[in-house]
Design a protein with these regions (language model features):
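Intrinsic-disorder/low-complexity, polar/charged segments enriched in Ser/Thr/Lys/Arg/Asp/Glu/Gln
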Residues: 19-23, 74-76
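Solvent-exposed, acidic/flexible segments
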Residues: 29, 33-37, 70-71, 80, ...
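N-terminal targeting signals for Sec/Tat export/insertion, comprising classic cleavable signal peptides
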Residues: 23-58
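Boundary at the C-terminal end of the N-terminal hydrophobic targeting segment
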Residues: 15-17
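An amphipathic, aromatic/His-enriched active-site/gating alpha helix that lines ligand/cofactor pockets
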Residues: 46-58, 78-132, 144-145
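Sec-dependent N-terminal signal peptides
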Residues: 3-13
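Acidic helix-start/capping segments at beta-turn-to-alpha-helix junctions
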Residues: 57-78
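Extended amphipathic alpha-helical interaction segments
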Residues: 137-142
Length: 146
């Protein structure tokens, strides 16, 4: 429901022509960095590589916090959608990807479930106002597939 309200807000402020980014802030539980990185590299990244190829998303990034004095989160997962329409369709698009890419569920390191190695703290959804692109950027190559 929260995503629907945010989507309506984005649409009402001319969200159709601007990209939408979803930022997930994740706290990795003590001593479980390896499991978290394995999970995101072998599942989250795979799903987004497929989504980029299908044109469902523009780009994605997984950022690790280098220094956080508050110590609240360790990872920021960023998924960029072309516009609010692609964002609105994201659940259906990713449901299709997950069903075909990992029909038996995600790959896990040490058989730990995600709740055992990470805590999703909060999500922020942003609308791009302006940006720069690297010289090699095209819609077919959004800069991270060099």
């Amino acid at each position: 429901m929260r995503h629907v309200l945010i989507l309506l807000l984005l649409i009402s402020v001319n969200g159709y022509s601007q990209s939408i980014s979803v930022l997930d802030f994740v706290q990795v539980k003590e001593g479980h960095r390896a499991e978290a990185v394995f999970f995101y590299e072998n599942n989250w990244k795979l799903y987004r590589d497929i989504a980029v190829k299908k044109g469902f998303i523009l780009s994605y990034r997984l950022e690790e916090v280098v220094a956080d004095s508050a110590g609240t989160f360790n990872l920021v997962l960023i998924t960029e959608y072309r516009d609010s329409v692609f964002f609105q369709n994201s659940e259906a698009n990713f449901r299709e990807i997950l069903a075909t890419a990992r029909p038996n569920g995600p790959l896990l390191l040490n058989h730990l479930q995600p709740a055992d190695f990470r805590k999703n703290l909060f999500v922020k959804i942003t609308r791009n106002l302006f940006r720069s692109y690297p010289p090699i950027y095209t819609t077919e190559n959004p800069g991270h597939l060099e």
